[in-house]
Curated annotation (Swiss-Prot):
Protein name per Swiss-Prot or TrEMBL: Snaclec CHH-B subunit alpha
Family, similarity comment: Belongs to the snaclec family.
Tissue expression pattern: Expressed by the venom gland.
Annotated source species: Crotalus horridus
Quaternary assembly: Heterodimer of subunits alpha and beta; disulfide-linked.
Molecular functions (GO terms): toxin activity
Amino acid sequence: DLECPSGWSSYDRYCYKPFKQEMTWADAERFCSEQAKGRHLLSVETALEASFVDNVLYANKEYLTRYIWIGLRVQNKGQPCSSIYSENLVDPFDCFMVSRDTRLREWFKVDCEQQHSFICKFTRPRR
Protein backbone atom coordinates (compact mmCIF):
# COMPACT_ATOMS: atom_id res chain seq x y z
CA ASP A 1 0.00 0.00 0.00
CA LEU A 2 1.08 3.55 -0.65
CA GLU A 3 1.28 6.07 2.15
CA CYS A 4 -1.38 8.67 2.78
CA PRO A 5 -0.70 12.19 1.46
CA SER A 6 1.01 14.67 3.77
CA GLY A 7 -1.36 15.85 6.49
CA TRP A 8 -3.57 12.77 6.27
CA SER A 9 -3.70 10.07 8.99
CA SER A 10 -3.51 6.39 8.08
CA TYR A 11 -5.46 3.48 9.54
CA ASP A 12 -5.81 0.04 7.96
CA ARG A 13 -6.26 0.74 4.24
CA TYR A 14 -7.76 4.23 4.67
CA CYS A 15 -6.61 7.84 4.98
CA TYR A 16 -8.40 10.48 7.06
CA LYS A 17 -8.19 14.23 7.43
CA PRO A 18 -10.31 16.67 9.43
CA PHE A 19 -10.87 20.10 7.87
CA LYS A 20 -11.55 23.20 9.95
CA GLN A 21 -13.47 25.03 7.21
CA GLU A 22 -17.15 25.39 8.06
CA MET A 23 -19.47 24.12 5.31
CA THR A 24 -22.93 22.67 4.84
CA TRP A 25 -23.10 18.86 4.63
CA ALA A 26 -23.45 18.89 0.83
CA ASP A 27 -20.58 21.37 0.38
CA ALA A 28 -18.35 19.34 2.71
CA GLU A 29 -19.10 16.13 0.79
CA ARG A 30 -18.44 17.94 -2.49
CA PHE A 31 -15.16 19.32 -1.10
CA CYS A 32 -14.03 15.83 -0.07
CA SER A 33 -14.96 14.30 -3.43
CA GLU A 34 -13.18 17.07 -5.36
CA GLN A 35 -9.88 16.37 -3.58
CA ALA A 36 -9.48 13.09 -5.48
CA LYS A 37 -11.52 10.16 -6.76
CA GLY A 38 -13.02 8.07 -3.99
CA ARG A 39 -12.82 10.67 -1.23
CA HIS A 40 -15.96 11.28 0.81
CA LEU A 41 -17.12 12.41 4.20
CA LEU A 42 -16.25 9.91 6.92
CA SER A 43 -17.96 6.54 7.09
CA VAL A 44 -17.10 4.21 9.98
CA GLU A 45 -17.13 0.46 9.48
CA THR A 46 -15.71 -1.02 12.70
CA ALA A 47 -15.31 -0.20 16.39
CA LEU A 48 -11.53 -0.12 15.95
CA GLU A 49 -11.84 2.37 13.10
CA ALA A 50 -14.18 4.50 15.25
CA SER A 51 -11.58 4.50 18.03
CA PHE A 52 -8.86 5.60 15.60
CA VAL A 53 -11.00 8.40 14.14
CA ASP A 54 -11.96 9.45 17.66
CA ASN A 55 -8.26 9.97 18.42
CA VAL A 56 -7.73 11.94 15.18
CA LEU A 57 -10.61 14.28 16.04
CA TYR A 58 -9.44 14.64 19.64
CA ALA A 59 -5.90 15.51 18.51
CA ASN A 60 -7.32 18.27 16.27
CA LYS A 61 -10.19 19.46 18.46
CA GLU A 62 -8.73 22.89 19.22
CA TYR A 63 -9.23 24.09 15.66
CA LEU A 64 -12.41 22.18 14.70
CA THR A 65 -15.94 23.42 15.32
CA ARG A 66 -17.77 21.74 18.19
CA TYR A 67 -19.65 19.55 15.71
CA ILE A 68 -18.12 17.69 12.77
CA TRP A 69 -19.97 16.40 9.69
CA ILE A 70 -19.76 12.69 8.89
CA GLY A 71 -20.99 10.95 5.74
CA LEU A 72 -24.06 9.38 7.29
CA ARG A 73 -27.45 10.66 6.14
CA VAL A 74 -31.02 9.46 5.77
CA GLN A 75 -31.87 8.73 2.14
CA ASN A 76 -35.66 8.42 2.23
CA LYS A 77 -38.20 8.08 5.00
CA GLY A 78 -38.60 4.45 6.00
CA GLN A 79 -35.30 3.48 4.36
CA PRO A 80 -32.08 2.63 6.21
CA CYS A 81 -29.41 5.27 6.70
CA SER A 82 -26.74 5.48 4.04
CA SER A 83 -23.23 6.82 3.77
CA ILE A 84 -23.53 7.12 -0.02
CA TYR A 85 -23.67 10.72 -1.19
CA SER A 86 -26.67 12.08 -3.05
CA GLU A 87 -27.77 15.64 -3.66
CA ASN A 88 -31.42 14.59 -3.44
CA LEU A 89 -31.88 15.14 0.28
CA VAL A 90 -35.59 15.01 1.06
CA ASP A 91 -35.65 16.49 4.56
CA PRO A 92 -33.31 19.27 5.71
CA PHE A 93 -32.81 17.30 8.95
CA ASP A 94 -31.33 14.26 7.22
CA CYS A 95 -27.62 14.73 7.92
CA PHE A 96 -25.47 13.51 10.79
CA MET A 97 -22.62 14.99 12.76
CA VAL A 98 -20.58 14.05 15.80
CA SER A 99 -19.54 16.25 18.69
CA ARG A 100 -15.84 16.68 19.32
CA ASP A 101 -16.75 16.65 23.04
CA THR A 102 -18.54 13.29 23.07
CA ARG A 103 -16.26 12.09 20.28
CA LEU A 104 -17.85 9.28 18.23
CA ARG A 105 -20.07 8.02 21.05
CA GLU A 106 -23.04 10.15 19.97
CA TRP A 107 -24.29 11.00 16.49
CA PHE A 108 -26.69 13.88 15.95
CA LYS A 109 -29.26 14.15 13.13
CA VAL A 110 -29.49 17.82 12.17
CA ASP A 111 -30.31 20.37 9.49
CA CYS A 112 -28.01 19.74 6.51
CA GLU A 113 -27.66 23.49 5.93
CA GLN A 114 -25.82 24.09 9.20
CA GLN A 115 -22.13 24.82 8.76
CA HIS A 116 -19.53 22.72 10.56
CA SER A 117 -16.03 21.33 10.25
CA PHE A 118 -15.82 17.88 8.66
CA ILE A 119 -13.60 14.85 8.15
CA CYS A 120 -12.83 13.19 4.80
CA LYS A 121 -11.83 9.57 4.17
CA PHE A 122 -10.56 7.59 1.22
CA THR A 123 -9.07 4.19 0.45
CA ARG A 124 -5.30 4.31 -0.03
CA PRO A 125 -4.26 3.48 -3.57
CA ARG A 126 -2.51 0.16 -4.11
CA ARG A 127 0.75 -0.16 -5.98
